[in-house]
Amino acid sequence: GAKELDGTLLNGKILLNLDTEDDDELSIGCAGGIDTNTSYSYQETSIHKEWEVLKIKLRGLLGGHSGMDINKGRGNANKWMARLLWELKQSNPVQLISFDGGSLRNAIPREATCRIAVANSEEAREKLLQTIANIKQEYIRIEPDHFFEIESVVSSGDAMNDSDCTKILNTLCAVHNGVFRMSPQIKDLVEASSSLARVIIHEGTFTTQSLQRSSVESTKSEVSMAIRSAFENMGATVEQGGDYPGWEPNRNSRILTLMEDLYKKLFNEPPHVKACHAGLECGILGKHLPGVEMISFGPNIRAAHSPDEKVQISSVQKFWSYLLETLKHIPQNA
């Protein structure tokens, strides 16, 4: 619906979006996004018969929304597993057999599993446990419930050749993940980010899915370019799509000034002026309505988009009176 809007049908210069879920909040911005999917065909080699095959599982990370939770310092299972393997490979002969991490493209990955073959199991386990201990100490206050499991398994099939293994682990460790830039306009707002959501290594193919977000279109292009460059540098095929625009905050818009003043007069306290690092319809609508000033507000809604969704009836009356007062004060020619 929003994507197919014909902007020529509307003449107004102010857009009131009635979709914010806290009645004391005025939303003035959101993030757009773009998906980056990569693929690389690697050379396979036989698993050394005398080497031991280990299965490493990482579980129990908090995960979360890769926009709203990206600034909370939570662990990314794909990045942790890549680090574990990279550090092991610096001192121990390793063959990488498989890797499966993450789930949804817009979620911070909570779990990852890989299988490797090692020449010296005792030395490899010692190095793995050392890196695991370092990670645990680094994230002790943020990720207290995560755990690694290492077990010996029987494995058939082939492993990745050594040069491709080095290339892929280097790329996974180097590619940006997390906050890319904070907003200079809105306190504590993430302006741009990237999340390495999915990594699969299986039977000759290495694929990844990541999502870049930004409320500023030029910055979204910058961060998506950085991710693209990292994977193209290793020879991977990169496809980017699903692009949707962000809504850049304008702290000096006339409608914001008006609604802030009205809120103070009506409710004897200032509203919370915020922007979010996730997608809202205003980002898409704004693309079709250049020059339009936008703001979003609404009654208290909880558990939105779930079977438990509910609205606080008392806040609907507050919201309604605020809406009517706002409409009264908007000039006829706006």
Briefly describe each language-model feature range:
Residues 91-92, 129-140, 228-236:
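A common structural junction motif
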Residues 76, 83-99, 241, 249-292:
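Active-site-adjacent substrate-binding region
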